[in-house]
Regions:
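AAA+ P-loop NTPase catalytic core and its hallmark functional loops
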Residues: 1-174
Length: 174
């Protein structure tokens, strides 16, 4: 069975999946288009060394009255909604983001996080929450504690056939 057929079987039933392999194979495309539950929302981010945990967790923003309101980051939004969170280039995350990823990637049965908002709201992942992370390196490039949080790690070593079909006809087969 090729890697894409295997992924199509695993993705709908696995809460945490790591896709790794060469750039341009369609890992992100697949994560955003396949194996979604009906009406499942998708949130996506691409991590860099400059990414902050606040992008995933949330932060305070000024409102019209000059006070500050808490704004959930995409990781917390995905948790609350039971959405799919696609994290591209997870291996590029800095220490700040890595620390928060440990909480996001905990087993959904046990995961919980207390937000640093005024209410000190404790959140848990809603039913259906899923993380699909991608990277161009290999799982050994990740800290062991982070890599171990992915029960499924798939090497995507061929180009995604569905992604090829989306290309203009003159580029297919190039």
């Amino acid at each position: 069975m090729d890697c894409w057929n295997l992924l199509s079987k695993v993705l709908p039933v696995t809460p945490r999946v790591l896709l790794y392999g060469p750039p341009g194979t369609g890992k992100t495309y697949f994560a955003n288009t396949e194996g979604l539950k009906e009406n499942q929302q998708i949130y996506q981010t691409t991590l860099t060394q400059d990414s902050t945990a606040a992008e995933l967790l949330g932060h305070y923003v000024p409102n019209e009255s000059g006070a500050f309101d808490w704004l959930d980051g995409i990781g917390i939004k995905a948790w609350k909604e039971g959405a799919r969170l696609v994290i591209n280039e997870i291996d590029n995350a800095g220490v700040d983001v890595m620390t928060f990823l440990h909480a996001l990637l905990d087993d959904p049965k046990f995961a919980k996080f207390t937000l640093p908002n005024k209410e000190k709201e404790t959140v848990r992942p809603a039913t259906g929450f899923q993380i699909v992370a991608t990277m161009n390196g290999v799982p050994d490039d990740l800290p062991e504690a982070l890599a171990d949080r992915f029960p499924v790690k798939l090497h995507m070593d061929t180009v995604n056939p569905s992604a090829i079909q989306e290309l203009p006809a003159n580029l297919q087969g190039v």
